[in-house]
């Protein structure tokens, strides 16, 4: 774990507004921020909190709260969910999947020393020699095993507020965008945070089409899992549309990659806990 975690911690004070947090996320290209709480010696402690893009969407925007008047300490998750640096990456995947989170803080003797994301796990599982996802290389159409065929959509003329409410209700991080009956793009939590909240745009009157990612980044169903992981990394995205003969047949996310490993390895994890 210690070899893959990010040791640089982006920390904000608890009185930071949601708009300011979104601006920091956009500036640093981050999906989460730690909320400051230190021990007597000035070290980040487990009693600190974390605020994520998902929190901004589900706990603020979808509920109609004003991002400029809401503070991060009102919505942060605290205490932090942690893992020690000597634990294997597979254990991190189980903790994330079981608790439905994308980030884990790494703690050493109650001091927060790093953070690890679901994207870090996926990259490790795919690229490491003999890694668990490599086992799928010999499977026919491996992306079809991982992708989700039930795809939530939204019309491009609908508002960002409606998109946020749908994401919150369905507990998902993206919506495929429909225009004239065609899938033309994707709107994600990241888009909403960086292009709407951080830009101080009104979610109730900003259209999804104005903030969606276009064109839709696609990958053929016959490509490998490693191809998908690398394309996500190159494009700095968490979702890919999977196509079969140029028709979108599924959606693949970073979480789907990690979930497969977590489910397969669950018996070992339960025996060791």
What is each of the regions a protein language model found here?
Residues 1-7, 47-81, 90-93, 97, ...:
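Tandem CBS (Bateman) regulatory domains
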Residues 25-28, 33-54, 96, 104-119, ...:
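A glycine-centered beta-loop-beta connector
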Residues 1-48, 144, 265, 271:
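Hydrophobic, helix-prone linear segments
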Residues 22-24, 37-43, 57-63, 128-134, ...:
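Short, functional N-terminal and low-complexity linear motifs
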């Amino acid at each position: 774990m210690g070899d893959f975690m990010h040791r640089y911690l982006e920390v904000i004070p608890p009185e930071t507004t949601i708009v300011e947090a979104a601006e920091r996320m956009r500036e640093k290209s981050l999906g989460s921020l730690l909320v400051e709480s230190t021990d007597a010696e000035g070290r980040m402690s487990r009693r600190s909190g974390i605020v994520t893009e998902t929190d901004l969407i589900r706990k603020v925007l979808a509920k109609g709260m004003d991002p400029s008047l809401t503070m991060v300490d009102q919505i942060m998750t605290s205490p932090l969910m942690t893992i020690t640096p000597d634990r294997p990456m597979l254990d991190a995947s189980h903790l994330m999947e079981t608790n439905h989170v994308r980030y884990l803080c790494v703690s050493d003797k109650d001091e927060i020393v790093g953070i690890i994301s679901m994207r870090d796990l996926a990259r490790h599982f795919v690229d490491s020699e003999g890694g668990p996802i490599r086992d799928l290389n010999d499977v026919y159409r491996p992306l079809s095993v991982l992708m989700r065929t039930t795809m939530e959509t939204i019309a491009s003329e609908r508002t960002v507020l409606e998109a946020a409410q749908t994401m919150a209700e369905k507990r998902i991080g993206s919506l495929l965008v429909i225009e004239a009956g065609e899938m033309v793009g994707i709107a994600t939590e990241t888009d909403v945070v960086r292009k709407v909240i951080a830009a101080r745009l009104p979610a109730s009157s900003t259209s999804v089409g104005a903030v969606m990612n276009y064109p839709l980044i696609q990958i053929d169903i016959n490509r490998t899992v490693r191809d998908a992981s690398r394309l996500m990394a190159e494009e700095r995205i968490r979702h890919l549309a999977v196509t079969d003969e140029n028709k979108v047949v599924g959606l693949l996310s970073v979480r789907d990659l990690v979930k497969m490993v977590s489910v397969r390895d669950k018996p070992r994890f339960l025996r060791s806990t």
